[in-house]
């Protein structure tokens, strides 16, 4: 019995050593992937171990059977280990392919969800479509074929078929330069209606040729004139601007019209007042502050009394007219006072200072051709006023003192005082 137990014990450690070696290799190669196989095998080992423990004291034949079964299990374990190793080496390759597939699907989703417009998508699709196509675009070869025209070959102009046989081959252009009846010599005279038609065609051909010859020089002349006009545009524009400028109008007529309007307004105001001072001259009123007594006497006397006194003084003393520096040589004295009164008025209007820079007489508004003539008029009339200023006493004061009736009655004014 002791021997059998020893043998069984020696057999059991051998089987256990084999199982431990196989399990150690399995655990080192595939610990994570084949847990289920290990659990299954461990259960079998546990069952087998239980059986060996139960049959520890049984016959040796049964022990041999158990050893054989354990060896078979070990062989199956080694085969399973080899398969697991191959699976471990092949598994990363499969995982990489799976990862690549997943990345490609993610990229496709990203590109689809990106902000691409419809036009860009269409362009991409078109580009992908054209890349697949094989387009061999080449220009077509054109063959230059020289066709011989019938006119050049036969040197006869072909016209429509509505003409009869001899006339459809006639050269109307050649017959147009010759006389209209020259074609009758070449061709038998046909019917009257066809003759009129051919005559009309020849006339039209001739007119067309004449118009072309007439229009050719016109076209050349117009082309040359257009070229010259383009070259001479700046100079012609200057000439046009000079012509467009109107001549300068002298400014003197505007001054004259303004002075005339002012004098008319003053006359209207004086006529509306209705006072006896309306006939008193302006220069007599301007110097009223110098001598009050003389101005009062002038305001009281009327225009008729002044004229009579002036006429009486001129009849008695014809030298009074000589005292005027601007007066013309004295005319011969007459006995009638009617002839003397207008002369006194003319002298007073000429030599006294003018009321306005221009005469009061109405002036026509027509502009003169020579503006220098207008300038001469005020110069001649300014001389009288200048000469009167050169004297010690102005002339209008002398005349006012001498013509007043109160001073004449008192005898204060005399020719010696005036000198």
Swiss-Prot record:
Pfam family, one: FAM217
Entry superkingdom: Eukaryota
Region (Disordered): 1-23, 100-119, 234-298, 362-388
UniProt biased composition (Polar residues): 7-23, 284-298
Biased composition (Basic residues): 378-388
PANTHER family: PROTEIN FAM217A, SI:CH211-266K22.6
Family: Belongs to the FAM217 family.
Protein's recorded name: Protein FAM217A
Organism: Rattus norvegicus (Rat)
């Amino acid at each position: 019995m002791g021997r059998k137990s020893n043998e069984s014990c020696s057999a059991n450690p051998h089987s256990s050593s084999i199982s431990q070696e196989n399990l150690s290799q399995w655990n080192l190669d595939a610990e994570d992937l084949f847990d289920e196989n290990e659990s299954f095998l461990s259960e079998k080992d546990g069952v087998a171990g239980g059986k060996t423990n139960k049959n520890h004291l049984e016959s040796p034949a049964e022990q041999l059977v158990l050893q054989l079964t354990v060896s078979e299990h070990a062989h199956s374990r080694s085969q399973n280990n080899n398969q697991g190793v191959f699976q471990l080496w092949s598994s990363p390759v499969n995982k990489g392919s799976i990862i690549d597939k997943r990345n490609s699907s993610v990229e496709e989703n990203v590109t689809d969800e990106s902000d691409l417009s419809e036009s860009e998508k269409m362009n991409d699709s078109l580009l992908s479509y054209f890349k697949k196509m094989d387009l061999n675009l080449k220009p077509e070869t054109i063959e230059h074929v020289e066709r011989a025209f019938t006119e050049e070959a036969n040197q006869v102009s072909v016209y429509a078929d509505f003409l009869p046989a001899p006339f459809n081959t006639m050269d109307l252009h050649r017959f147009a330069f010759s006389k209209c009846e020259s074609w009758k010599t070449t061709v038998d005279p046909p019917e009257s209606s066809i003759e009129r038609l051919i005559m009309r065609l020849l006339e039209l051909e001739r007119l067309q040729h004449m118009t072309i010859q007439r229009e050719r020089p016109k076209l050349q002349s117009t082309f040359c004139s257009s070229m010259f006009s383009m070259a001479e545009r700046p100079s012609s524009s200057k000439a046009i601007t000079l012509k467009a400028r109107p001549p300068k109008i002298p400014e003197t007529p505007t001054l004259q019209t303004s002075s005339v309007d002012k004098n008319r307004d003053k006359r209207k105001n004086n006529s509306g007042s209705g006072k006896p001072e309306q006939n008193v001259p302006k220069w007599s009123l301007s110097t009223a502050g110098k001598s009050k007594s003389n101005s009062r006497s002038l305001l009281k006397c009327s225009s008729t009394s002044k004229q009579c006194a002036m006429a009486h003084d001129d009849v008695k003393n014809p030298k009074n007219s000589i005292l005027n520096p601007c007066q013309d040589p004295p005319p011969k004295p007459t006995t009638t006072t009617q002839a003397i009164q207008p002369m006194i008025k003319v002298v007073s209007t000429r030599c006294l200072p003018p009321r306005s820079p221009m005469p009061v007489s109405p002036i026509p508004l027509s502009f003169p051709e020579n503006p220098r003539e207008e300038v001469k008029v005020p110069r001649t009339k300014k001389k009288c006023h200048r000469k009167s200023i050169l004297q010690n006493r102005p002339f209008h004061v002398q005349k006012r003192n001498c013509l007043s009736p109160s001073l004449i009655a008192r005898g204060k004014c005399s020719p010696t005082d005036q000198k």
